[in-house]
Amino acid sequence: MFVLSGYEYLLGFLIICSLVPALALSASKLLRPTGNSLERRTTYESGMEPIGGAWIQFNIRYYMFALVFVVFDVETVFLYPWAVAFHRLGLLAFIEALIFIAILVVALVYAWRKGALEWS
């Protein structure tokens, strides 16, 4: 029996996963409308005429909230597999997860005390 006999499905899946996006991108390039008029190059503003430029400055507080959100969102992504396999992992994994959560709580308290979560 051939050694890689169990991997044909994986190889087929990888080929399909490579071909589908390539075909979709090729089809959209072939079917797109051609023309380079000024009307096509302007931004679409829900049927209204665009007013002003697109370069506006955002308050830095938005970025701070976004960074804090990303940190705790990644925490959820790391804790979800642990929560699914909680009963099989044992006490050591529970202690490691508690240490991980404690580090994130310390980071949250630090951000709170530094004023990163204050809007004023």
From Swiss-Prot:
Keyword Translocase carried by entry: yes
One Pfam family, short name: Oxidored_q4
GO annotation, cellular component aspect: NADH dehydrogenase complex; plasma membrane-derived thylakoid membrane
InterPro entries the UniProt entry points to: NAD(P)H_OxRDtase_bac/plastid (IPR023043), NADH_UbQ/plastoQ_OxRdtase_su3 (IPR000440), NDAH_ubi_oxred_su3_sf (IPR038430)
Membrane spanning stretches: 1-21, 64-84, 89-109
Entry keyword set: Membrane, NAD, NADP, Plastoquinone, Quinone, Thylakoid, Translocase, Transmembrane, Transmembrane helix, Transport
Keyword field contains Transit peptide: no
HAMAP family hit by this protein: NDH1_NuoA
Name of the protein described by the UniProt record: NAD(P)H-quinone oxidoreductase subunit 3
Gene of this entry: ndhC
